[in-house]
């Protein structure tokens, strides 16, 4: 099968969130099953042309009355046969930032930028004389792709090509002024028919939900949640209408990177039978953060974007957040790695100065993120909503028991602790509040000090979990086949 991925993020070239990891890992998993997978993405400012191969001849892309000339570069995903085509346009992509910058969080010309990507994706296929069986578009930034396939390319060489659209996070929809609609390259007559119209604005995600042959999202529970107003972000009606075409497929984990027995970032590698090595990583983590080195005290780790979705108000809010009370009342240590909202960064620094058992690192550090997973005993992830989540799966594989809210992919991957039997793989909050976080952390700490056999049993079970991409790839192939069948029935 010939599969074209269109994405705004791709590891190792550009990453803002888990989207980048997911598209890379899925593409490689499909290629390993002998499918011809190619990825189209922008060549951002930080992607050096010197490391890419230029494809001769510029391409003309028409957006409204304007003609844009774009270049194309080529490379491969590391250690794979997956080709990556980079759309090169200095005005659109020759700047720092994927969607925005520190000075402009959401670029004002994003409609034009990502419309250019969508149109260019089809032009690249023509240029390479390669017509895919399926176009798989990821998140709002690629939302125009299924629209073009349905309305603009329906009588071209792409007439038999099916579309699949994956929702990685309903909270990000690509909503812009109606006056930018001509930048999509569509006619004003298409404003309503394409699904772009959203309360007198344009909405890339909505257009994709309306136009795609099949829809997926990144966990079974999230597929159910987004059909409800609480999690649907105003799109729940469309998703209920299209529920037969919507499939939830749990993301996998790249176990070549996240594997405690092979992890190159941690000082002591281990497995479920050598957990004493995990304790050595704990001592290194404590020393690294300037905490008292004491393996008898449980360490609670957290790696997160510091945004409202992640439950930061309930955990770190200066007025009612539970972190200060947790660290004051319970014998434990807490380490946090992340960046995001300025008030939260300031609060974390304040807690680090005020509390001897709390430390933070503002920013991101790959080596430190692996050490936190390996050296912590518990992992905090009290998300308000979580489409899939990766860190709870990393934590399970590392024997670091997650503390999560029952939502989305967290509900699909973490089994709540049973005090009587010792079964489970983590600790689950039924609802999100400062008190529920406090109670659940206290529950975990109680088990640590009083139920050592249960902790060991849970760790062993957690580390036996399988989160490879092979299962997810098979499920996506089924969705692709359904999309092709649906497209054929409409011809």
UniProtKB/Swiss-Prot annotation:
GO term, biological process aspect, one: glycogen biosynthetic process
EC number(s) on file: 2.4.1.21
Keywords: Glycogen biosynthesis, Glycosyltransferase, Transferase
Residues that, per the record, bind ADP-alpha-D-glucose: 15
A family per Pfam: Glycos_transf_1
Catalytic activity: [(1->4)-alpha-D-glucosyl](n) + ADP-alpha-D-glucose = [(1->4)-alpha-D-glucosyl](n+1) + ADP + H(+)
Pathway: Glycan biosynthesis; glycogen biosynthesis
Molecular function GO labels: alpha-1,4-glucan glucosyltransferase (ADP-glucose donor) activity; alpha-1,4-glucan glucosyltransferase (UDP-glucose donor) activity
Keyword ATP-binding in annotation: no
InterPro entries per record: Glyco_trans_1, GS/SS, Starch_synth_cat_dom
Listed transmembrane segments: none
Enzyme class: transferase
Ligase listed as a keyword: no
Function comment: Synthesizes alpha-1,4-glucan chains using ADP-glucose.
Annotated NCBIfam families: glgA, PRK00654.1-2
The family this protein is said to belong to: Belongs to the glycosyltransferase 1 family. Bacterial/plant glycogen synthase subfamily.
Protein name, per record: Glycogen synthase
Organism name: Treponema denticola (strain ATCC 35405 / DSM 14222 / CIP 103919 / JCM 8153 / KCTC 15104)
């Amino acid at each position: 099968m010939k599969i074209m991925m269109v994405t705004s993020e791709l590891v190792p070239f550009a990453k803002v969130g888990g989207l980048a990891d997911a598209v890379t890992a899925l593409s490689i998993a499909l290629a390993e099953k002998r499918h011809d997978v190619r990825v189209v993405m922008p060549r951002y400012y930080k992607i050096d042309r010197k490391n890419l191969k230029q494809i001769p001849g510029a391409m003309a892309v028409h957006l409204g009355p304007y003609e844009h000339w774009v270049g194309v570069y080529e490379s491969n995903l590391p250690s794979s046969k997956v080709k990556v085509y980079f759309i090169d346009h200095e005005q659109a992509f020759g700047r720092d930032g994927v969607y925005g910058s520190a000075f402009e969080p959401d670029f004002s010309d994003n409609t034009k930028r990502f419309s250019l990507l969508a149109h260019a994706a089809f032009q690249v296929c023509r240029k390479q004389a390669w017509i895919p069986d399926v176009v798989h578009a990821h998140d709002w930034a690629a939302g125009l792709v299924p629209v073009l396939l349905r309305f603009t390319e329906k009588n071209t060489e792409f007439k038999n090509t099916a579309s699949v659209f994956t929702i990685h996070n309903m909270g990000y929809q690509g909503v812009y002024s109606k006056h930018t609609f001509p930048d999509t390259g569509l006619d004003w007559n298409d404003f309503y028919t394409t699904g772009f119209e959203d309360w007198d604005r344009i909405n890339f995600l909505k257009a994709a939900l309306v136009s795609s042959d099949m829809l997926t999202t990144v966990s079974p529970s999230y597929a159910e949640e987004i059909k409800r107003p609480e999690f649907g972000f105003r799109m729940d009606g469309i998703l209920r209408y299209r529920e037969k075409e919507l499939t939830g497929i749990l993301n996998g984990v790249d176990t070549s990177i996240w594997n405690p027995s092979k992890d190159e970032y941690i000082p002591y590698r281990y497995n479920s039978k050598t957990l004493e090595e995990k304790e050595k990583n704990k001592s290194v983590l404590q020393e690294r953060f300037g905490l008292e080195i004491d393996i008898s005290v449980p360490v609670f780790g957290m790696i997160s974007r510091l945004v409202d979705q992640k439950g930061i108000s309930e955990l770190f809010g200066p007025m009612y957040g539970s972190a200060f009370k947790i660290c004051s009342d319970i014998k434990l240590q807490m380490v946090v790695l992340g960046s995001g909202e300025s008030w939260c960064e300031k609060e974390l620094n304040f807690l680090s100065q005020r509390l001897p058992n709390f430390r933070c690192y503002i920013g991101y550090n790959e080596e430190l993120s692996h050490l936190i997973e390996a050296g912590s005993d518990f992992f905090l992830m009290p998300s308000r909503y979580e489409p899939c989540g990766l860190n709870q799966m990393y934590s399970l594989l590392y024997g670091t028991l997650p503390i999560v809210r029952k939502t989305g992919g967290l509900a699909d991957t973490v089994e709540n602790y049973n005090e009587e039997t010792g079964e489970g793989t983590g600790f689950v909050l039924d609802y999100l509040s400062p008190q529920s976080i406090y109670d659940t952390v206290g529950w975990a700490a109680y088990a640590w000090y009083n139920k050592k056999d249960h902790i060991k049993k849970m760790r062993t079970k957690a580390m036996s979990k399988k989160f490879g991409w092979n299962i997810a790839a098979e499920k996506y192939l089924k969705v692709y086949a359904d999309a092709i069948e649906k497209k054929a029935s409409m011809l």
